[in-house]
Amino acid sequence: MNLYIIRHADAGDPKQWQIDDAARPLSALGQKQAGALGEAFKRQGIVLQAVVSSPLVRTRQTAEGIMAALGLAGEPTFSELLEPGAMRPRKLSNELVELKVDSVAIVGHDPDMPNYLCWLLGLEQRQLYLEKSAVACVRTGKEPDKGEGTLGWLVTPEWFV
């Protein structure tokens, strides 16, 4: 399975947001990053069979921007395990297996996305950092598990924006 582990695009400064943080949308830069990431996937010939996202607004908008650039219809699949602080790596891997796909993008938050990436690669938590809109491609077997992933590549938004 190819997993594309993505931290949501730029959503501005959370300290400037006065309403419920779950409703914080992407900034203009974040909207550009999400679309550019989808365009970069297209240029590289990456075909996503599924996109799974945290239900929070900024992650949903990131996922939708990627999907729109790729011409994928419908909405992303939402997982409560991708909400901030809800990450359970093995449970998330089980959810991904249930999708019965070979290529899936996962859009979530810091520190959960880097920690899931580390779990897949067999590293201690917090050994890797994903900046906003960064993406890591991890290749796993049919059932992603701890330490069984291989890092294909990791890029920051400067690569595709």
Predicted feature residues:
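Glycine-rich phosphate-binding loop signature in dinucleotide/nucleotide-binding domains
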Residues: 44-46, 97-102
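Active-site-proximal alpha-helix that buttresses catalytic centers in soluble enzyme cores
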Residues: 2-86, 113, 126-132
